UniProtKB/Swiss-Prot annotation:
The lineage of its organism: Eukaryota, Metazoa, Chordata, Craniata, Vertebrata. This is Immediate early response gene 5-like protein. Belongs to the IER family. PANTHER family: IMMEDIATE EARLY RESPONSE GENE.
Length: 293
């Protein structure tokens, strides 16, 4: 109880000090206000804790039960305990000597009846001979054989690999060695594309005409430099510094900008002491406290 009274007196003193110091100005008084508010908070917590402890002591408690009622455990009578013979009766029936008859195969008369859909005749498949199974199937990509009516038709296609820059000539979608119309297997013509600009064909020299069958060749593109597209002016570092200063001024807000404007005006008309007073007058209470310390 004595602690609660001391806390209450501290609360009244701190409230009085805060009320008296609000009428004065200065950073020292502001710092004292912060200390007094800290003491006020601690005294209030102590007073409330003492108050709640006293109320808790006065509260009546319900009577505790001396003995807990234990639940009755049902005891099994000797009649409910299963015997050995009854335990075997509840188990699954075992296969005795008569179980051998169950394992015998069923006779033809006792076979299971099949559904009517199973009796419907299925079309018999003709067995294929090994020669017919392994016979080659003509594909659309190969050239026609010599026994066909028309002459062999082959289309030329030029393919360029972007990773290795290798030009490959393909006929009818396959390489020369896959085409059966050729008498001897021929290797595909591969030539490396030149590093410079210009068109390149896969069959012959630059002057040879390939006709309509050849596709247009791939022309590599030169990658431009970053400096070509985004030239950097000479006066860019000075502009960036000015932008940084303007950003800092905008961050500090109107108080900092007002301080600079007042300082420029005071340099012309007033001395340094009066300039500081005007600048501090334009700032808030927290800023004055920081400047005072």
């Amino acid at each position: 109880m004595e602690g609660a009274l001391d806390a209450q007196s501290l609360i009244s003193l701190s409230l009085r000090k805060i009320h008296n110091s609000r009428t004065q100005r200065g950073g020292i008084k502001l710092h004292k206000n912060l200390l007094v508010s800290y003491v006020l908070r601690n005294a209030r917590q102590l007073y409330l804790s003492e108050r709640y402890a006293e109320l808790y002591r006065r509260q009546p408690f319900p009577q505790t039960m001396d003995e807990c009622d234990e639940p009755d455990i049902p005891e099994l009578s000797p009649l409910q305990i299963p015997e050995e013979g009854e335990d075997e009766m509840h188990q699954l029936p075992r296969i005795h000597s008569g179980g051998a008859e169950l394992l015998e195969p069923l006779s033809s008369e006792e076979t299971l009846e099949l559904p009517p859909c199973a009796h419907s005749p299925h079309p018999a498949k003709e067995p294929q001979s090994h020669a017919a199974f392994y016979s080659p199937v003509p594909s659309r990509g190969f050239c026609s054989s010599g026994e066909s009516a028309g002459p062999p038709q082959c289309s030329h296609t030029t393919v360029l690999d972007l990773d290795t820059h290798v030009v490959t000539t393909v006929e009818s979608g396959y390489l020369h060695q896959d085409c059966p119309c050729q008498g001897a297997p021929l290797l595909s013509k591969r030539k490396y594309a030149p590093a410079g600009y210009g068109s390149y064909s896969g069959h012959g020299g630059p002057g040879e005409d390939l006709g309509d069958t050849a596709e247009p060749s791939f022309v590599p593109c030169k990658r431009g430099r970053y400096e070509d597209f985004c030239p950097q002016p000479l006066g860019e570092p000075a502009d960036s510094n000015n932008n940084n200063i303007s950003n800092l001024i905008s961050i500090f807000g109107s108080g900092f900008s007002g301080l600079m404007s007042r300082q420029t005006e005071a340099e012309q008309t007033l001395n340094g002491h009066l300039c500081g007073k005007h600048a501090l007058g334009s700032l808030g209470a927290w800023t004055r406290a920081i400047v005072a310390f």
